[in-house]
């Protein structure tokens, strides 16, 4: 158990730091105010699949909190949504065989269906509803922001997140691939 705790802390720390750095460096504005295309969710997805839902949640929650704190201040509705996104994607850890070096077509499809569902939940429900409840934001504005963020994140994760997972899986030793000469 101790080894898992150390892995969780290290993965969370590195993931949160990457979330902040990538979020600041790659921030492509969209036509919707205060909404941009961001690639850090691809890295969060990789870490969530490899290390599980706790790391997925913490990378999003801590990383987004730090990222917001370095700019305009924490926006808790979106911070929580980032955490929930990572948690949901992290639930795929037990189903995907990425640690065994296997990430095939059906795994890619499953991963992308889950990440799209997680994006719908995070950006189509949690972030806008909490924006309305916590910050009294206009519903049409926050649902437009959530829609654009969810679509952008789904596409970037489908491309960059899938690519990261394919590369990671290829770096792992496949079960039964080693033989004694």
From Swiss-Prot:
Main subcellular location: membrane
UniProt entry tagged with the keyword Membrane: yes
Presence of keyword Cytoplasm: no
Protein name, as recorded: UPF0397 protein SSU05_0404
Cellular compartments annotated: Cell membrane
Gene3D superfamilies linked: 1.10.1760.20
UniProt family annotation: Belongs to the UPF0397 family.
Organism encoding this protein: Streptococcus suis (strain 05ZYH33)
Superkingdom field: Bacteria
Cellular component terms per the entry's GO annotation: plasma membrane
InterPro entries: ECF_substrate-spec-like (IPR009825), UPF0397 (IPR022914)
Transmembrane regions listed in the UniProt entry: 9-29, 46-66, 70-90, 108-128, 147-167
Keywords noted in UniProt: Cell membrane, Membrane, Transmembrane, Transmembrane helix
PANTHER family: UPF0397 PROTEIN BC_2624-RELATED, UPF0397 PROTEIN SPR0429
């Amino acid at each position: 158990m101790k080894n898992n705790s150390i892995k969780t802390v290290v993965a969370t720390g590195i993931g949160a730091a990457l979330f902040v750095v990538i979020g600041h460096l790659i921030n492509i504005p969209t036509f919707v105010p205060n909404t941009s295309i961001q690639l850090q969710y691809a890295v969060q997805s990789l870490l969530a699949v490899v290390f599980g839902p706790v790391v997925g949640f913490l990378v999003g929650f801590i990383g987004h909190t730090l990222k917001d704190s370095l700019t305009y201040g924490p926006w808790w509705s979106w911070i929580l949504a980032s955490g929930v996104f990572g948690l949901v994607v992290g639930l795929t850890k037990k189903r995907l065989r990425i640690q065994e070096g296997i990430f095939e077509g059906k795994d890619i499809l499953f991963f992308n269906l889950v990440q799209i569902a997680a994006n719908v939940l995070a950006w189509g429900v949690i972030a806008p509803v909490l924006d309305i409840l916590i910050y009294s934001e206009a519903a049409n504005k926050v649902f437009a922001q959530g829609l654009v963020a969810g679509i952008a994140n789904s596409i970037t994760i489908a491309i960059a997140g899938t690519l990261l997972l394919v590369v990671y899986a290829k770096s792992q030793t496949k079960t039964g691939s080693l033989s004694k000469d």
